[in-house]
Amino acid sequence: MTEITIKDKILRLQPVQHVPEISLYLSDSPHHKINTEDRFECWQQAWVGGQALARYILDNPELVAGKTIVDIASGCGIVAIAAKIAGAARVIAIDDYEPAIQCIGLNAGINNVEIEIVQEDIFNYSSDVGDLFLLGDPFYDEQLFDYVQNKFTPVLVGSPIRLPYYVSYYNSSIQTYTLSVPPGFDETNSFDTHIWWLSE
């Protein structure tokens, strides 16, 4: 099955541009045609922060091998899937939106990995289970940034510079990728996307 519909959104199975080991059901709509200010829309794409973090995990599997990994605000599930492929013993993907939950399940299945999927608002997530917490391109507001920083450890993030209050973290980034995006998918053709420890 190469095409599915979730919540009136048509998703097509396609290899991820910068992580070709993984194929996902994704929207063909350009990013600027998705309401990125509405976090409930963001599950349709593999954003560059998620792609960068997935790439880093697959290239450095020792970070996750044999561990329990928690992917926060999982979206399409790319980071969770990468962690499982890289050898994580257990992967928990958390998102609070039902279409995202459906999408993660379908994407895990097409990549032949088992992921525990939890539908819950991250601000209500009380479990302390997890050897490593992962976030791919999650920070669009300061509230989530502060909450995650204070609640979970260790936390590894993949993200371009989206908001000024965490620019200082990029001074200690452990990897930077310049990731291109398809023409028309954003206002720019590429992003410098950083991997960094929010807490460790």
Model-identified regions with their sequence ranges:
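S-adenosylmethionine-dependent methyltransferases
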Residues: 1-200
